[in-house]
Amino acid sequence: MMIAACLLGPSRGLAHPLGNFSINQYAGIRITSEAVEIRYLVDLAEIPTFQEMQDWGIVATVGDASLERYLPGKMEALKRGLRLDVDGHPLSLQTVSTEILFPPGAGGLPTMKLGALYRASLSSGASGARVLHYRDTNFASR
């Protein structure tokens, strides 16, 4: 009975378990014989979203014209913060797609979710075991 109450009870705090100042990142890495793909997601809580809106003059509405200049530049900057090496050689990531969402947050403030699919081709001449090293240097001070 207690389990049901926990599962069905209020879910306050699930969106940003570290609070409304948090920035959470996720990188899903898919490796094939031809390429490495990184599905990169950044979840900004209410305060970082507000700061981005103020700094960049964006409107928290999907499709707003302000996002046409913001999103490509932001995702390029985030891509520069990712390091991907195979067998000690850096790979060049290319942006395949980007997306942005503004889920509602606490107190009626928006939050922001940024997403990108990055892809790097692998050289076709290599065979056998290979070593991949990934590093995310974005938001290092947080």
Regions of interest found by a model, annotated:
Residues 14-142:
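N-terminal soluble domains immediately following signal/targeting peptides that reside
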Residues 1-9:
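Bacterial N-terminal signal peptides
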